[in-house]
Amino acid sequence: MNTLTPTRRRGTALRLAAASLGVILALSGCVQSGRTTHPDNFSGELTCPVEPDPSITTSARIAWQAIPNGDLVVKDLQLLEACMPEANISWLKMNSGGDVIQAFGSDSLDISQVGSSPVVKAASPPLSKDLKVIWISDVIGDAESLVVKDPSIESLADMSGKTIGVPFGSTAHYSLLTALGEEGLSDEVGVINLATDAILAAWQRDEIDAAWVWEPTLSELLAEQGHTILSSEASAGLGAPTFDLIAGTDAFITANPEFMRMWTLVQAEGTRLLNEEPELAATSISVQLGVEQEDAEKLLDGYIYPTLEEQAGAEYFGGDGLATALTSTAEFLETQSGIDALAEDGVYQEMPYGEAIEEVTR
């Protein structure tokens, strides 16, 4: 598998350098510091970081997940609405990659936040949805981790005979399968499918010994005498990087090139805020996730946020790095019965859609 090595953001290594693109202006006055009202009730002035385009009248159904990345910043500040005032933007909440797969399968979405494993599953038989990856929201590090209850367990090697809960089809599931396979424990550990909101209850009822999960459930388990023994950053070191991506249907993307150009500029601004002004971005994260500002800032340290310029490079959309990672993910999931079968030749390699990124970086 191909291991991708983007620059680590502040808190886990050096902060990403700012993308000095003339098309992106400094965003000022967008965030009201200390704002606690839900963004759906936000009545402040909407500010677009680029020249708004009222000629775009696209109707877009966009799904989001409670993951601390630029997509939440974009949603909270209503940047898409500000930059495309005549477009019809509908935001839908999804709780997991499995929910996203079902929604794409029923043609209920145009664009969605989705993990690298679920998007591969959606593109594979029997669903075989024609999806394109249009943005990398983050590369997952310590934000997804294996938390165990027994204090005597210090490593994955101690987990033989234990039961681990994880949302099936998620990036956490992929990381867990990778780690178990590397340790030779695939047949020695019980793995059960639990949604994130069911994991804490199963933990408290002693139905599971451990869980590979993300925030806020991760912190809840740690508060219940749990401790971390492994993370998705370690799985990436084994050649299995995981991502939170944004994907869209090929039909929607092909039919709406101007929308995709503006959408890409807006996502780039969300990422810029995370890397250059993390305290400002954390205000949006705190509102969307319903957590304290300080806690929101800490959440950001578990992820890497590739800039627009980095995403345009050979390691991602400008070369075959992302395509190779998606292909490797599919091949691994097929060996672990995570998907029924591999898609036809070329499907995973053609999933990255870099046209809009290339256009706005010219």
Task: Give the positions of each predicted feature.
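Short, surface-exposed acidic
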Residues: 88-89, 187-189, 290-301, 339-348
